[in-house]
Amino acid sequence: MATLPILDLWSTNKALVSLTISASLLLVSLLVSLFQVGRRERGLPPGPPTRLVLGNEHEIPKADSHFLMSKWAKQYGGIFSLKRFRNTTIVLTDWKIMKELVDKKSTNFSHRPPSKVADLITRGNHILMMQYGETWRTMRKLIHQYLMESQCEKEHWKVQEAEAAQMLHDFLVDPENHMKHPKRYSNSITMSLVFGIRAKSVNDEYMTRLYSLMEKWSLVLETGATPPVDSWPLLQWIPERFMGYWRRRATEVGDLMTGLYTEVLHVIENRRKAGIYKDSLMDRVLDKKDKYRFDEHQLAFLGGTLMEGGSDTSSSLILAIVQAMTQYPEVQKKAHAEIDSVIGTDRSPAWSDFRKLPYINMMIKEAHRWRPVLPLGVVHGLATDDSYNGMHLPKHSTVILNVWGMHMDPDRFENPDAFIPERYANFPELAPHYAALADGAARDHFGYGAGRRICPGIHLAERNLFIAVAKLLWAFEFKNNPAGKNDASAETGSSQGFMHCVKDYDAIVTVRGEERRQTILRELEQAQTVFAKYD
């Protein structure tokens, strides 16, 4: 009996030893696992050296990361990888690789990576950020059917030319507000077609709220602007004051977005209750509301997403072209000469003049290349494991389309920082033609994205740009104002965020003669019959 305490002691010690060994093994396992975090796994595309746990996260700037991505592409090639804690990011900066992966393997590359910030803002209902699935396909089909090329050729050009007529008048009578007129033009086209509502002036409430919202949305979504809560979920629980108030910023943008888009939807619904129906996209959707079975938030974001896409991209490129005219007068002179050889002073250019004005088309393509609205595109996500040229591309990787790096490649574009429309002398067609070619190197630019996520409004946007630029250069001469500000630098002259637009600049706007002035006034009067459908 005296030996029992000894046995009890041994039994207790044995349990403690076992527990200690188990805890030690667990600790070693955790340490080994931790030491793997941030490391580039064997088989991944090459990339910059990583740090323990962080990977490359510490190197990614909060703004303008496309410059660093392009620098890395020169060092590591057209496909390279980054580690952001546990997550892998694949960066594509090669025209052919882009085609081989994003276009030809579009089923795998059409997803979006998980985004806590995007979900907080949109609840998953923004088609730009929406996961690839049935709802996305339904919305995409609706947009495509309404904005397809045949619809643009048959109907939409009338609204575009009428709104361009007002834009010319706005430039004529209010040249000091030249930064706002292209925004009203593109916004009003979109509002008319999507909702049956015009933006009559640069002070339109919905337009003003939208562009303010887009600035905030763009800043929140820029690569590097938000703590990597998707890569390291534990960061969600750190007090926001130590993390740049990321959740608060996202929630504020989401509230503004939901408020605006829902308000516009209610205007349409109330109009229909009053017995007023218009041939807008949202009217068509509401006609078949039971078929599509969208909830209110989805309906609001379907229209709101189109309001965004149709307003911001076209106006940003028009403003970039006008700025280029103040910096490259020889280009403007060539454009004037081409227009004057085809169009007189008794009418402004129309969409039907497209084939007669190839230099204008070259200018638009060069603007896409020179000042892309989305320098890093919109991130894609890999659904399953994939590979390229022996390199492993793991599922759930984030895929960045480095549009800036491709557009500024000196091996493809001599003197890439300069605005030289002649680069596109052998590209007479519109952008959709080149996006559909099997050879990725034959594409004109990546301004509209790639794969199944390519901009569904591409046909409308191409016509927006041609009509606006041709009419503006027919009507006006744009000169640099030496007494004002005009920063045309790629590094400092554009806004920050995932969407870029040139910063406000001063310009001298001069109408090209009295006959053109009278034509502008007359064509605005003629446009009233089109406006009457939407007022």
Swiss-Prot record:
Biotechnology: Terreic acid is a metabolite with antibiotic properties. Terreic acid also acts as a selective inhibitor of human Bruton's tyrosine kinase in mast cells and other immune cells.
Keywords: Heme, Iron, Metal-binding, Monooxygenase, Oxidoreductase
Highest taxon of the lineage: Eukaryota
Enzyme class, spelled out: oxidoreductase
InterPro entries linked: Cyt_P450, Cyt_P450_E_grp-I, Cyt_P450_sf, Cytochrome_P450_fung
Stored Pfam families: p450
EC number of this enzyme: 1.14.-.-
UniProt: heme binding residues: C455
Catalytic function, reaction form: 3-methylcatechol + AH2 + O2 = 3-methylbenzene-1,2,4-triol + A + H2O
UniProt GO MF annotations: heme binding; iron ion binding; monooxygenase activity; oxidoreductase activity, acting on paired donors, with incorporation or reduction of molecular oxygen
Cofactors demanded by this protein: heme
Effect of disrupting the coding gene: Abolishes the production of terreic acid, but accumulates (2Z,4E)-2-methyl-2,4-hexadienedioic acid, a degradation product of 3-methylcatechol.
Spans through the membrane: none
Pathway: Secondary metabolite biosynthesis
Family in the record: Belongs to the cytochrome P450 family.
Role summary: Cytochrome P450 monooxygenase; part of the gene cluster that mediates the biosynthesis of terreic acid, a quinone epoxide inhibitor of Bruton's tyrosine kinase. The first step of the pathway is the synthesis of 6-methylsalicylic acid (6-MSA) by the 6-methylsalicylic acid synthase atX. In the biosynthesis of 6-MSA, atX utilizes one acetyl-CoA and three malonyl-CoAs as its substrates and catalyzes a series of programmed reactions including Claisen condensation, reduction, aldol cyclization, and the hydrolytic cleavage that yields 6-MSA.
Annotated protein name in UniProt: Cytochrome P450 monooxygenase atE
Source species of the chain: Aspergillus terreus (strain NIH 2624 / FGSC A1156)
Lineage: Eukaryota, Fungi, Dikarya, Ascomycota, Pezizomycotina
